C-alpha cells in the first residue's frame, strides 16, 4: 500500500470493482435470511443535495452491516419521476419534461455512484416509464371493478398557479404546499380511491408497528381521526328537507341553540335562491382558505339562512346559519352548535347574539362562568329532561338510545380521513385508464389497451396541458365504437405507493408483481425517509400494501417492519441587503469567516468584501443559497469522508449541522487509520495471536478492542446510534496509536485490532476499508467478510480499580483481583500509603463497599 491516503485514487478503483463484479446484485435465496433495506426514492430534480446523501448513506450503512451478518440483502434504487417541477423546468428551458427528467436521472445516477452506495442497479425503476405505470393503470381498473374507485363532482382544493387539485394533506395553512399560492375551492369531477374503507385497518395496523417512530404513528392516528358518536337527523321547518349532523357529544344535545352548515351544503343553496346577500356570503366563504389547520385561528363568520331546524327531542326551532368554519368535506357538512360547551360555537354565538344554554355542570364543586368561555369538559347533565344528573357515559348511551328509538339518530363511527382524490389536471403523470363512451358511460380501459401511454415528445407552452390541448390524443375505440380517454393523470403519490413492491420483480412482464419474489423480499425490513411524509406517502404506502394483499399479491399486512426518519441537514445562511432592500443570499462556500474563542461566527464577508448577515443554521435550500454540493465535497475530500461526517455529526433522527471543519476532521481520522495500517504493514505479525501468552498491557488493549466491538455491534444493529458507534472506534484508535509494536505478540494483538477496526468502519467508509482489508493480507474482498464478533472471554477483567474515599473524599485508588471479596479489598485499601494518612489514629465508624467500584470509609477522631 502507498504511504499517503489518497481517496481520489482508491475510490474510483473500488467502485469499478463493485460495478464489474455486481457485488450488490440481489438474488432470491430461500436458504438465506433476507434483509430488504429501502430509502425513499428521490424526485430527479437535477442534482443530489445533502438531504439525499444523508438518507442514502444511512441506508447503505445498514445494508452493508446486514450483509456482513450473512443476510441476503436487497437495496434497490429508482426515481419518482413524474411531477410538476418537470413541467416548470420544461417551460423555462424550452424542452420536453421527459427529456429533462431522463437527463437528470443520468446525472444524478453518476453522482450516487461517486458516493459508493451499494445499490442493485439491475432493479432500477423510473416511474415515468410505461412498463412501470402500465401495472398501476391495470390495478386501478381492478380496484374500479371491485367498487373501490369512483368518480364524483366535488369541491376540491384548487391551486390556481399550478392549475391542479391538491389533496387535503397538500394544503399547508391555506396555501399550496409546492408554490405557496392561496388555495381556492372549486367544483370539478374527480376520481377517488376508497381509502376510507380501510380506515379501521390503517388505524389498527399501527399497533402492529412497534419499530415505527411514535410520532409518525400519532400523526397517522390523528389524521385518520376515528371518533364514536351519533348521527342525528333534524327536520327543516316548513319544508320537506332534512339536515343530518354528526356529534361525539350527544350528552350536550339539549343545549343545541343553532345549526351551522357549510357554504357548499345544499340547504345553503336553497336558502340563497331569493337572498342575494346570503348568496354573496356563500361565494365568499367558498373561496376562503380551506385548510383544516386554519379553522381554529381564522375569524368565525356566518349568516342566518332564514331556515329553522326542529329539535327532535324538544320540538324547539333552531336557526340554521351558514358558517365559514363548517367544511362540506368533513362529516355531513353540518354541525349542531352547543355554545355553552364548545368554544368555537361559544365565540360564534357571542358574536351573533345567539342563545347560550348550559346543559353540563362540573362534577366537582367548580365555579364556571359561561359569559366568558364555554365549559368543554365532561360533567353531569342539567336542563336535560330525564337525563339530568347522568354522567357522560350514561347520557351518551341514554340519549343515543332515545334518538335511535325515535328513528332520528344512529350510533356511528366516523373518521376524519377522506377518500383519496387521485385526479390531477397536469400533463406529466400517468394517464388515468378510464374511457368515456358516446352514451356518456365511463368504463375502465381493457387490459389489451394498457398501458395508455403518455406522449413524451411534447412542447410545453405554460398555458395548456398537451394531452388536453390535443383533441386527437383522447380519441380511441372500444369494441369498434368511438370512445374518449381520460385526460387527467394520476397523483404522483400513486407511483410512490407501490414502487417498493415492484423492486422485488422489476422486469416481471406477466403481471403487476411476481408473488413468489414479492413474498420472499417483503415486507421491507428497514425503510428510511423524512417525517414530513407521515400523513401522505407513508399512509398511502400502507394503504396500497393492504390493497395488494387483498388482491392476492402479498401475504403481509404492512409494507415495512421498521421505519427510521432521518433529520434535516442544516447549513449556515448568509445574506446582504441590496439597494432595493432585497436580501441577496450568498453561498457559505464563498464566505470568509472570523470566529471568537468559542468558535462562534463574529464576522462574515463575501468575495467582494461585503459584510454579511449570518441568519443562523437553517435547512439547506435553493431560496437561501445555502446548499452544499455533495459532488464538490466528494471531489475535495473523498466519498468516505463525506459519508463518515454524515454518520458522525449527529444522531440519525436529529438535524445535522453541516460544518466543513467537521468534514476536515473526518478526513484526518481516516488518514490516521490509514497511517496505522501502513505502520503495521512495515513490520507485520509473523505468528498468530496466542491469548495464553499475553502481557497485562496486551490483555488490557485486547479487552478494549472487544468491548468496542460489542458496543459498535449494538449501536449499529439494535440502537441505530451510528454516531456513538463511530465515536467508540475513534476512542479505540486513540489507544491503538499509542500501543507498542515491539514484540511479536504486540503485533499479533494489533493485527486482530486492525482487522476489527476495518470491518467496523466498512459499512460507513467502504472504499478505504476495501483497500485496508487487502493491505492486512486478506485474499477475498471485504464485501464478503463477516462482521467481527466480540470475544466474551477477552472482555472479562482480571483486575478492578477501586476508588477509596475517606469521609466522601477520594484519598486513593487501588487495584484488586476482579473476584476479590470485601475483606481483601479493605486490607489492600487500608495498606495504601495515602489512605493510611487519613485513617490512622481515627475511629472507623463504618465501611461502605460498592462491589468492584468504590470503598468509602467513614471515620471520626
Swiss-Prot record:
Positions contributing to ATP binding: 622
InterPro entries reported in the protein's UniProt record: aa-tRNA-synth_I_CS, aa-tRNA-synth_Ia, Leu-tRNA-ligase, Leu_tRNA-synth_edit, M/V/L/I-tRNA-synth_anticd-bd, Methionyl/Leucyl_tRNA_Synth, Rossmann-like_a/b/a_fold, tRNAsynth_Ia_anticodon-bd
Enzyme Commission no: 6.1.1.4
GO function term, MF aspect, one: leucine-tRNA ligase activity
One GO-annotated biological process of the protein: leucyl-tRNA aminoacylation
Positions occupied by motif 'HIGH' region: 42-52
Annotated Gene Ontology cellular component terms: cytosol
Record's keyword terms, sorted: Aminoacyl-tRNA synthetase, ATP-binding, Cytoplasm, Ligase, Nucleotide-binding, Protein biosynthesis
Subcellular location: Cytoplasm
Family: Belongs to the class-I aminoacyl-tRNA synthetase family.
Name of the protein: Leucine--tRNA ligase
Lineage: Bacteria, Pseudomonadati, Pseudomonadota, Gammaproteobacteria, Pasteurellales
Gene: leuS
Amino acid at each position: 500500500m502507498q504511504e499517503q491516503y489518497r481517496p481520489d485514487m482508491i475510490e474510483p478503483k473500488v467502485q469499478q470493482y463493485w460495478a464489474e463484479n455486481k457485488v450488490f446484485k440481489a438474488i432470491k435465496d430461500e436458504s438465506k435470511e433476507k434483509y430488504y433495506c429501502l430509502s425513499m426514492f428521490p424526485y430527479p430534480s437535477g442534482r443530489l443535495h445533502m438531504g439525499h446523501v444523508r438518507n442514502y448513506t444511512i441506508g447503505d450503512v445498514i445494508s452493508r452491516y446486514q450483509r456482513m451478518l450473512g443476510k441476503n440483502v436487497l437495496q434497490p434504487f429508482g426515481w419518482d419521476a413524474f411531477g410538476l417541477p418537470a413541467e416548470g423546468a420544461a417551460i423555462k428551458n424550452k424542452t420536453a419534461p421527459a427529456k429533462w427528467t431522463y437527463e437528470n436521472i443520468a446525472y444524478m445516477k453518476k453522482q450516487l455512484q461517486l458516493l459508493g452506495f451499494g445499490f442493485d442497479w439491475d432493479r432500477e425503476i423510473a416511474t415515468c416509464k410505461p412498463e412501470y405505470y402500465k401495472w398501476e393503470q391495470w390495478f386501478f381498473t381492478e380496484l374500479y371493478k371491485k367498487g373501490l374507485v369512483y368518480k364524483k363532482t366535488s369541491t376540491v382544493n384548487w391551486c390556481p398557479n399550478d392549475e391542479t387539485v391538491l389533496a387535503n394533506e397538500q394544503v399547508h395553512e391555506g396555501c399550496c404546499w409546492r408554490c405557496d399560492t392561496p388555495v381556492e375551492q372549486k367544483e370539478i369531477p374527480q376520481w377517488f380511491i376508497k381509502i376510507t374503507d380501510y380506515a379501521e385497518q390503517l388505524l389498527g395496523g399501527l399497533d402492529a408497528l412497534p419499530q415505527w417512530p411514535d410520532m409518525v404513528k400519532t400523526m397517522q392516528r390523528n389524521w385518520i381521526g376515528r371518533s364514536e358518536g351519533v348521527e342525528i337527523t333534524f327536520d327543516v321547518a316548513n319544508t320537506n328537507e332534512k339536515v343530518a349532523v354528526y356529534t361525539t357529544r350527544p350528552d350536550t344535545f339539549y343545549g343545541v341553540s343553532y345549526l351551522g352548515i357549510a357554504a357548499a351544503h345544499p340547504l345553503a343553496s336553497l336558502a340563497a335562491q331569493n337572498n342575494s346577500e346570503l348568496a354573496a356570503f356563500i361565494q365568499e366563504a367558498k373561496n376562503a382558505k380551506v385548510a383544516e389547520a386554519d379553522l381554529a385561528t381564522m375569524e368565525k363568520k356566518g349568516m342566518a339562512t332564514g331556515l329553522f331546524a326542529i329539535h327532535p327531542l324538544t320540538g324547539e326551532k333552531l336557526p340554521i346559519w351558514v358558517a365559514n368554519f363548517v367544511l362540506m368535506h368533513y362529516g355531513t357538512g353540518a354541525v349542531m352548535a352547543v355554545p355553552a360547551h364548545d368554544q368555537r360555537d361559544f365565540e360564534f354565538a357571542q358574536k351573533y347574539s345567539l342563545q347560550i344554554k348550559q346543559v353540563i355542570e362540573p362534577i366537582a364543586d367548580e365555579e364556571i362562568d359561561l359569559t366568558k368561555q364555554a365549559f368543554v369538559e365532561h360533567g353531569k347533565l342539567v336542563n336535560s329532561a330525564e337525563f339530568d344528573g347522568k354522567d357522560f357515559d350514561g347520557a351518551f348511551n341514554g340519549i343515543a338510545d332515545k334518538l335511535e328509538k325515535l328513528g332520528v339518530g344512529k350510533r356511528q363511527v366516523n373518521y376524519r380521513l377522506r377518500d383519496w382524490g387521485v385526479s390531477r389536471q397536469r400533463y406529466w403523470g400517468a394517464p388515468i385508464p378510464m374511457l368515456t363512451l358516446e352514451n356518456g358511460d365511463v368504463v375502465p380501459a381493457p387490459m389489451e389497451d394498457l398501458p395508455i401511454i403518455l406522449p413524451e415528445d411534447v412542447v410545453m407552452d405554460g398555458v395548456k396541458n398537451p394531452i388536453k390541448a390535443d383533441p386527437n390524443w383522447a380519441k380511441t375505440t372500444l369494441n369498434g365504437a368511438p370512445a374518449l380517454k381520460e385526460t387527467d393523470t394520476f397523483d404522483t403519490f400513486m407511483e410512490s405507493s407501490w414502487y417498493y413492491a415492484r423492486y422485488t420483480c422489476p422486469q416481471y412482464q406477466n403481471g403487476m408483481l411476481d408473488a413468489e419474489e414479492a413474498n420472499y423480499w417483503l415486507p421491507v425490513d428497514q425503510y428510511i425517509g423524512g417525517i414530513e411524509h407521515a400523513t401522505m406517502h407513508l399512509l398511502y404506502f400502507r394503504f396500497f400494501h393492504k390493497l395488494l394483499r387483498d388482491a392476492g399479491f402479498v401475504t403481509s399486512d404492512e409494507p415495512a417492519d421498521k421505519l427510521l426518519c432521518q433529520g434535516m441537514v442544516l447549513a449556515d445562511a448568509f445574506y446582504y441587503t441590496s439597494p432595493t432592500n432585497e436580501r441577496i443570499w450568498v453561498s457559505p462556500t464563498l464566505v470568509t469567516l472570523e470566529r471568537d474563542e468559542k468558535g462562534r461566527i463574529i464576522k462574515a464577508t463575501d468575495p467582494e468584501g461585503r459584510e454579511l448577515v449570518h441568519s443562523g443554521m437553517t435547512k439547506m435550500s435553493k431560496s437561501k443559497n445555502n446548499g452544499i454540493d455533495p459532488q464538490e465535497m466528494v471531489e475535495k475530500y473523498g466519498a468516505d469522508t463525506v459519508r463518515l461526517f454524515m454518520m458522525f455529526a449527529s444522531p440519525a433522527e436529529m438535524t445535522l449541522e453541516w460544518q466543513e471543519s467537521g468534514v476536515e476532521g473526518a478526513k484526518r481520522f481516516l488518514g490516521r487509520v490509514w497511517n496505522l495500517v501502513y505502520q503495521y504493514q512495515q513490520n507485520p505479525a509473523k505468528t498468530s495471536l496466542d491469548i495464553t501468552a499475553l502481557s497485562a498491557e496486551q490483555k488490557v488493549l485486547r479487552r478494549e478492542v472487544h468491548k468496542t466491538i460489542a458496543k459498535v455491534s449494538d449501536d449499529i444493529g439494535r440502537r441505530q446510534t451510528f454516531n456513538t458507534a463511530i465515536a467508540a472506534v475513534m476512542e479505540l484508535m486513540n489507544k491503538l496509536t499509542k500501543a507498542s509494536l515491539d514484540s511479536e505478540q504486540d503485533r499479533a494483538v494489533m493485527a486482530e485490532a486492525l482487522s476489527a477496526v476495518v470491518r467496523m468502519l466498512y459499512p460507513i467508509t467502504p472504499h478505504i476499508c476495501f483497500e485496508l482489508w487487502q493491505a492486512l493480507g486478506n485474499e477475498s474482498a471485504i464485501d464478503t467478510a463477516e462482521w467481527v464478533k466480540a470475544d466474551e472471554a477477552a472482555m472479562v477483567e482480571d483486575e478492578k480499580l477501586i476508588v477509596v474515599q475517606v469521609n466522601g473524599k477520594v484519598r486513593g485508588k487501588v487495584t484488586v483481583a476482579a473476584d476479590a471479596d470485601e475483606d481483601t479489598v479493605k486490607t489492600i485499601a487500608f495498606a495504601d500509603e495515602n489512605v493510611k494518612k487519613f485513617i490512622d489514629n481515627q475511629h472507623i465508624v463504618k465501611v461502605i463497599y460498592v462491589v468492584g467500584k468504590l470503598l468509602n470509609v467513614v471515620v471520626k477522631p
